[in-house]
Swiss-Prot record:
Keywords on record: Coiled coil, Merozoite
Annotated protein name in UniProt: Uncharacterized protein MAL13P1.336
Compositionally biased spans, kind Polar residues: 263-276, 308-331, 520-530, 591-602
Organism per entry: Plasmodium falciparum (isolate 3D7)
Compositionally skewed regions (Basic and acidic residues) per UniProt: 115-127, 165-181, 499-515
Region feature Disordered, mapped onto this chain: 78-220, 251-280, 296-332, 459-657
Low complexity composition-biased segments: 190-215, 297-307, 460-474, 481-498, 531-590, 617-656
């Protein structure tokens, strides 16, 4: 053995003596260990080291392995376990860094490599023995035919208690690598090809044959077991495992009745004539009829129109809650006030948060037969004003009789009068001021020689009439709802806008540049939720009232005279001063396209300025804009942003309609007008 030599002369002799003693002891242990086969077997099971792990270990750096077997038989001279990590006591520490060739520490692992190779050879010999035993076992299987009549192929009889069979049985019990010899004892396999009705009989015959031959069951089984075709291979017992295995199959006494079929309510659909389904939106029609379930079919006795009952039978409970409301707009030509009368009963604070069933997009949902009878339209309004469902039927019948005699007198109804009063957008307390504003040369009036004109360009006024919020409860794009006096012939001013708004695709107007395009001015929002209460198709909302009651027309027209917006607390410009709004900053933005813009000193200077609060959080268009809950006018914000204060006379005041498609175009034009005010041209279209 090569070991580190110590320079010190005193220690050199001692090291040499220790090496000689170790070599002698190793030779003795080699001779003894070669004769012990038990150690070889134990090493085969316990030592799993190879050369690639042992090479590289030196005297000073060993592998910490607890070796069992030969190393434990070395006696007292062998070092203790883990000694490979311990350094030999040397006084000269300077030469510890110098190491010779790395070899196995024979002191800790004597003759380890030789013993491992011997173990490998012995294991290979054992495998050869097992292979021979496997061949012998196969011969036994061929000679022993267990379940036949007891004769093998050569005509010799075999006894189940013979040594050959017992050896095979013992071998299969302890050898896990050998295949299970139950394969030839699977009675279920032999009976699978037979009819299922004969399985038990065939199994009993096989068992009787085995018992008569005194062979018995080779593997310890119960002789009275019943084997069926559903027991898994290799299992014993009477429990079936196949698809016919159920925990318990019983009957309930008495037999339970069959489940009831789902209830289908086709009452509403039966009221839809087939000739009118073609041109209408079927989806919204079906949802509207399902929401308007009939309360009493006798309501239709006094009407030739069968679908009137489903329109009038809106549950009042839904009106008085924050839940879904059925806002009914019947005929395209009969612009009645059902939405307003429904929402009169809405509680404050709940209306804006609720998802309202919007039936406004369908021109003729409930009034399916297109009955151009104002009385049938007003029946819905009167029904919405009923707080007691018990009085609903009588009141409907009375109203049908009364309204047939008074077809043109819509404003005599209390509900219609109250709704026309609600159309005064902010429950205005000072109607004289509003009328004075209407008479002051079409919303232009002079104060301190400054010309003020309300336009669609107001940015500094909070709570404007139209909201850009998605969950807004105002009518979506209140288009030309209040035409005003003498404007009955201008019914088609917004047809182009309505056609564009009827399209279902989302044009992504808001997603381009919110601050420049949408919030730059207050325009309609085509991407607003479809669940909002909108008045999209009410092109001629109050023209029915214009025929008879001019006073109510004045009230409705005043909504638009106030700059075409819902100023709420700013119903007249005098109130603007009272609300801490400076005239120049508030109204200076209204001079962008007006004649006489130069007459308002410093007006256009504040055109695109925001106050400090609005610079931080653009609340002007996002907080409570047109939220009718604050003013008890839940649905009264129906201003006209396209038909401005001139009632369709666009040549007046150079004030043109503004659509959301025209925002960029008009914005560039307005910027040019700031630098170069346009000349007065009354003939400009």
């Amino acid at each position: 053995m090569e070991d580190k030599e110590v320079v010190n002369s005193e220690n050199k002799v001692e090291v040499i003596k220790e090496e000689e003693n170790i070599k002698k002891e190793d030779d003795v242990t080699k001779k003894v260990s070669e004769n012990t086969e038990d150690n070889d077997i134990s090493l085969a099971n316990n030592v799993s080291l190879g050369k690639h792990l042992l090479i590289g270990s030196s005297l000073k750096k060993g592998i910490s392995v607890s070796v069992r077997g030969r190393t434990m038989n070395l006696g007292m001279n062998a070092k203790q376990a883990g000694s490979a990590w311990k350094k030999k006591e040397t006084e000269n520490v300077e030469e510890e860094g110098e190491e010779k060739e790395k070899k196995i520490d024979d002191e800790s692992f004597p003759d380890l490599l030789e013993s491992t190779e011997k173990m490998k050879s012995e294991l290979s010999k054992e495998k050869d023995k097992k292979k021979k035993q496997l061949k012998d076992g196969k011969k036994v299987e061929d000679n022993v035919n267990v379940f036949n009549s007891g004769f093998d192929r050569g005509g010799k009889t075999t006894d189940g208690n013979s040594t050959e069979f017992n050896d095979k049985k013992k071998y299969n019990m302890y050898d896990g690598n050998k295949k299970n010899d139950n394969a030839f004892n699977k009675k279920w396999y032999n009976n699978q090809q037979n009819d299922m009705n004969n399985n038990n009989q065939n199994n009993q015959n096989n068992m009787n044959n085995n018992n008569n031959n005194n062979n018995g069951h080779i593997f310890d089984t119960n002789e009275s077991e019943e084997v069926t075709g559903y027991i898994l291979p290799g299992f014993k017992g009477k429990h079936m495992v196949g698809f016919t295995c159920f925990l318990k199959r019983g009957t309930q006494n008495p037999v339970p009745p069959p489940p009831a079929p789902p209830l289908t309510n086709n009452q509403g659909e039966n009221n839809i004539p087939t000739d009118n389904r073609n041109n209408e939106n079927k989806k919204l029609m079906n949802t509207n009829i399902k929401m308007n379930q009939q309360v009493d079919n006798n309501n239709n006795n006094n009407n030739n129109n069968n679908n009137l009952g489903s329109a009038m039978n809106t549950p009042m409970n839904n009106m008085n809650k924050g839940g879904p409301r059925n806002n009914v707009n019947n005929s395209e030509h009969m612009r009645e006030h059902s939405n307003h009368t429904v929402n009169r009963f809405a509680p404050m604070g709940q209306y804006a948060n609720s998802k309202n069933n919007n039936m406004n997009n369908v021109h003729n949902v409930n009034n399916v037969n297109n009955v151009n009878n104002v009385n049938n339209v007003n029946n819905v309004n009167n029904m919405n004003n009923m707080n007691n469902m018990n009085n609903m039927n009588n009141n409907m019948n009375n109203m049908n009789n009364n309204m047939n005699n008074n077809m043109n007198n819509m404003n005599n109804m209390n509900s219609m009068n109250s709704m026309n009063n609600m159309n005064n957008m902010n429950s205005m307390n000072n109607m004289n001021n509003m009328n004075n504003m209407n008479n002051n040369n079409n919303n232009k009036f002079n104060e301190n020689n400054i010309l003020y004109k309300g336009t669609n360009y107001n940015r500094n006024v909070k709570n404007l009439g139209q909201n850009n919020n998605e969950g807004n409860t105002n009518m979506k794009h209140g288009h030309n709802n209040n035409r005003g006096q003498g404007n009955n012939n201008n019914n088609n001013n917004n047809n182009n806008f309505n056609r564009r708004n009827d399209k279902n695709d989302n044009r992504n107007f808001r997603r381009k540049d919110i601050d420049l395009e949408i919030n730059w001015r207050n325009t309609a929002n085509p991407t607003q939720e479809e669940n909002n209460n909108n008045m999209n198709h009410n092109n001629n909302y109050n023209n029915n009232n214009n025929n008879n009651n001019n006073n109510n027309n004045n009230n409705n027209n005043n909504n638009n005279t106030n700059h075409g917006k819902n100023f709420r607390n700013f119903n007249n410009l005098n109130n603007m001063k009272n609300n801490n709004s400076s005239n120049n900053k508030m109204m200076g933005m209204n001079h962008m396209q007006q004649k006489g813009m130069n007459s308002s000193t410093g007006g256009h200077k504040y055109s695109f300025n925001k106050n400090d609060d609005q610079k931080n959080n653009n609340k002007m268009y996002k907080n409570n804009m047109g939220n009718a809950n604050n003013n008890n006018n839940n649905n009264a914000v129906n201003t006209n942003f396209n038909n401005n204060n001139n009632n369709g006379n666009f040549h007046m005041n150079n004030n043109k309609s503004i659509n959301s498609m025209d925002v960029k175009k008009t914005r560039m034009k307005d910027i040019r007008n700031l630098n170069d005010p346009p000349k007065v041209n009354n003939n400009e279209a």
